[in-house]
Amino acid sequence: MPVRKTALIKTLSVGFALLLIIPCVTAGEPDLLREENDYRVSMEQMHLNQKTRQFIRTYIRANREELDEVKEKSRSPFAITDSVFNAYELPVQLKYLAVIESDLKTKAVSRVGAAGPWQLMPETARLLGLKISSHKDERKLYDKSTDAAARYLKDLHAEFGNWLLAFAAYNGGESAVYHAIHMSGSHHYWQLQGYLPAESRTYVKKFIATCYFFEGRSSLKEFCMGS
């Protein structure tokens, strides 16, 4: 059936209008509004508002070179983390926290004394069974520190009930999350985030951005839906 001229003009007009409102996406930059072959879960369903989406775009754009370098060297460490997290029945995407913490560097040490790929503090590491002495620091052993981090993250998830709160606690401590819950009267991350330290809020968004960079939008569903 031939297309009527008025219908064609209307279709073209709508299409042109859409071009005006959809943000321009640079080649190679993630498009969080339209991802090919993945329309099942919208960003709105995952509570990722425009401000969060813009953070993800900006973060990946600013850190693309560094993220690409980590990606190139990630096969061996990610094989370890995948094995450990599968053994503990945890999402393998938790491995991207180590990207945020240290760029997967086993010898990384922070100014406050956190060390290893998971940047564990000495007291936390010892509670998790890692040995630290002048001769040996198991926080810097990828397999042992990953096992400790997995157990810690599993405990945090059991304590707070969702992953985004667990990430905030991993970064800023459980007391900061409990304070945010008390002040907001909510256990939902997106409702209480305003009461969290700015560093923890940024940390959670960095995880979302890094996870998206490595795996795409569908990988975020488990972490953001219902959080």
Residue ranges and their predicted role:
Residues 218-227:
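Surface beta-strand/loop "capping" patches
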Residues 2-10, 16, 20-89, 94, ...:
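An acidic, Gly/Ser/Thr/Pro-rich helix-cap/linker signature
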Residues 149, 157-175:
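Non-catalytic, structured segments within soluble enzyme domains
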